[in-house]
UniProtKB/Swiss-Prot annotation:
Transmembrane segments: none annotated. It comes from the Eukaryota. Keywords: Amidation, Antibiotic, Antimicrobial, Cytolysis, Fungicide, Hemolysis, Secreted. Its main location: secreted. It is found in: Secreted. Disulfide bonds: none annotated. GO terms for biological process: defense response to bacterium; defense response to fungus; killing of cells of another organism. Has antimicrobial activity against Gram-negative bacterium E.coli ATCC 25922 (MIC=25 uM), Gram-positive bacterium S.auerus ATCC 25923 (MIC=50 uM) and against fungus C.albicans ATCC 90028 (MIC=25 uM). Has some hemolytic activity against human erythrocytes at high concentration. GO terms for cellular component: extracellular region. Belongs to the gastrin/cholecystokinin family. Magainin subfamily. The modification Leucine amide is found at L21. Expressed by the skin glands. This is Peptide PGLa-B2.
Length: 21
């Protein structure tokens, strides 16, 4: 539920951050 949602958001941010690098 919430943990899964938070993990998805973190993954999205991480992907964007890696893309910015």
């Amino acid at each position: 539920g919430m943990a899964s949602k938070a993990g998805s958001i973190v993954g999205k941010i991480a992907k964007i951050a890696l893309g910015a690098l």
